[in-house]
């Protein structure tokens, strides 16, 4: 099922006690990714999902990582991949989710599901964050949520 929900969100930095905006000292790929995951998590919680876990990793090399594990009110477990790109010059955020990346996410999800005696229904969502999340006076980003973006078959 392919449909998306888009929303522009203002992710301006919070002011400090002195009124000045608190910006990160150095913007790194990791800090951008962390900001995108935080924005995606807040967006999904606002849409009614419940946060379970962030950055679940399988042990050992060659495993996978799940950015967010969420649950919808009907009990479905949602494995969320968050992708952020500040520009579309290299195809945008969605273009970076290859078949190999999907297989790694599915592998990690199967590992995660081993903790359950009976398997809950689950799906794989993608949240795309288009635009810059840090820097500038009023940074804007558009969040696009793709429920059931791919499946494990």
Swiss-Prot record:
Pfam families: UPF0102. InterPro entries: Restrct_endonuc-II-like, tRNA_endonuc-like_dom_sf, UPF0102_YraN-like. GO terms for molecular function: nucleic acid binding. CDD domains: PoNe_Nuclease. Belongs to the UPF0102 family. This is UPF0102 protein Pnap_0271. It comes from Polaromonas naphthalenivorans (strain CJ2).
């Amino acid at each position: 099922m392919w449909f998306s929900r888009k929303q522009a969100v203002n992710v301006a930095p919070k002011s400090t006690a002195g009124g000045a905006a608190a910006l990160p000292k150095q913007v790194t790929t990791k800090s951008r990714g962390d900001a995108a995951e935080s924005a995606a998590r807040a967006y999904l919680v606002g849409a009614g999902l419940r946060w379970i876990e962030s950055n679940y990793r399988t042990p050992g090399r060659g495993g996978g990582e799940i950015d967010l594990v969420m649950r919808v009110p009907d009990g479905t477990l949602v494995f969320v991949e968050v992708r952020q790109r500040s520009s579309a010059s290299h195809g945008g955020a969605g273009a970076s989710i290859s078949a190999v990346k999907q297989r790694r996410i599915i592998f990690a999800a199967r590992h995660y599901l081993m903790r359950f005696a009976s398997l809950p229904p689950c799906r794989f969502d993608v949240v795309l964050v288009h635009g810059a999340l840090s820097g500038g006076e009023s940074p804007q980003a558009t969040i696009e949520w793709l429920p059931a973006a791919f499946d494990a078959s």
